[in-house]
């Protein structure tokens, strides 16, 4: 069965090996911090080519928030998140756990995403 979320290790590996143009926001990544695994890590990107998510990507590490995510076409996260078709985390939203089109490396195809709900971990 396909896991709906990526593990911390899988997310770190993707970050270390991707050639995507990355913008990093939120808390600094500190693998030695005891609470670091409690943060939610979300990577959301502008492009999908076949089963690969990439292009311009943003990586978020932190707690509960609403992320402004215009032009998002795919995403991955270490906890279940919501993705919405309007800014401000409203209108029509879906959960990563119910991803309809899975992509490589734990990503989900999420065309039309404009914001992402990061719940408390």
What is the predicted function of each stretch?
Residues 1-41:
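N-terminal prepro-regions of secreted/extracellular proteins
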Residues 34-121:
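Mature secreted bioactive peptide module from preproproteins
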């Amino acid at each position: 069965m396909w896991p709906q979320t990526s593990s911390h290790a899988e997310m770190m590996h993707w970050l270390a090996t991707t050639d995507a143009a990355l913008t990093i926001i939120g808390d600094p990544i500190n693998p030695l911090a005891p609470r670091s695994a409690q943060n939610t890590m979300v990577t959301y990107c502008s492009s999908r080519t076949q089963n690969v998510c990439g292009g311009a990507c943003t990586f978020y590490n932190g707690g509960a928030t609403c992320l402004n995510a215009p032009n998002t076409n795919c995403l991955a996260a270490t906890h279940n998140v919501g993705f919405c078709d309007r800014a401000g985390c409203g209108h029509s939203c879906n959960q990563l756990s119910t991803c309809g089109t899975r992509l490589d490396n734990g990503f989900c195809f999420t065309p039309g995403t404009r914001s992402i709900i990061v719940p408390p971990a």
